[in-house]
Curated annotation (Swiss-Prot):
Main localization (coarse): cytoplasm
Full protein name: Peptidyl-tRNA hydrolase
Family classification: Belongs to the PTH family.
CDD domains: PTH
Main function: Hydrolyzes ribosome-free peptidyl-tRNAs (with 1 or more amino acids incorporated), which drop off the ribosome during protein synthesis, or as a result of ribosome stalling. Catalyzes the release of premature peptidyl moieties from peptidyl-tRNA molecules trapped in stalled 50S ribosomal subunits, and thus maintains levels of free tRNAs and 50S ribosomes.
Record's catalysed reaction(s): an N-acyl-L-alpha-aminoacyl-tRNA + H2O = an N-acyl-L-amino acid + a tRNA + H(+)
Key word Cytoplasm present: yes
Enzyme class: hydrolase
Organism from which the protein derives: Bartonella henselae (strain ATCC 49882 / DSM 28221 / CCUG 30454 / Houston 1) (Rochalimaea henselae)
Molecular function via GO: peptidyl-tRNA hydrolase activity; tRNA binding
Subunit and interaction comment: Monomer.
One Pfam family matching this protein: Pept_tRNA_hydro
A single GO BP: rescue of stalled ribosome
Length: 193
């Protein structure tokens, strides 16, 4: 069994924010595979399906970003899942828009959602970091992450989300490098990298 969580903030006013790219990726995965209708459990929206023949839970915490670990921790404990079977998808200021990095474990780089998960669950899980870029001034970070994706972002965002959904099974198989290569190739094929 696997748990894939996307980070974001609940509510219509946040749905197109850069900070919600994790939710967007989960929605893309949901639409690409046969998953159950969303239900509410563990302070989250959750759906069940199969990816690569493995039972997989998709989860979108409804606790707001800074408390994401509460919902994720509840789900991991309830399903008795090991951190090696947990993937989280979230926004990354320190990557250019449209870039992706995957790593196991590590620090939180100041991301409050990741801080919360680390505190509630531990640190040895797979992280898919999706670049949203960093504004020129530190004072603009809050406004940037809670700002909506722009029209120019729509040149790369749908392609990135589609590539993640199309290739997520590679991560479940343990092929981190191939996952990264396939996403990079998909973006290059659309002249986006």
């Amino acid at each position: 069994m696997w748990l894939i969580a996307g980070l974001g903030n609940p509510g219509l006013q946040y749905q197109n924010n850069r900070h919600n790219i994790g939710f967007m990726a989960i929605d893309a995965i949901y639409q690409s595979f046969s998953f159950s209708p969303w239900s509410k459990k563990f302070q989250a929206e959750i759906s069940t399906g199969l990816i690569n023949g493995k039972k997989t839970f998709l989860l979108k915490p409804q606790t707001f970003m800074n408390l994401s670990g509460q919902a994720i921790g509840e789900a991991l404990r309830f399903y008795k899942l090991d951190l090696k079977n947990f993937i989280v998808i979230y926004d990354e200021l320190d990557l250019p828009p449209g870039r992706v990095r995957v790593k196991i474990g590590g620090g939180n780089n100041g991301h409050n959602g990741i801080k919360s998960i680390d505190a509630h669950c531990g640190t040895d899980y797979c992280r898919i970091r999706l670049g949203i870029g960093r504004p020129n001034s530190k004072e603009l970070v809050y406004q940037h992450v809670l700002g909506n994706f722009t029209k120019s972002d729509q040149e790369w965002l749908p392609s990135l989300l589609e590539a993640i959904a199309k290739n997520i099974a590679l991560l479940i198989k343990g092929n981190k490098c191939l996952f990264m290569n396939e996403i990079s190739q998909a973006m290059k094929n659309k002249n986006l990298q």
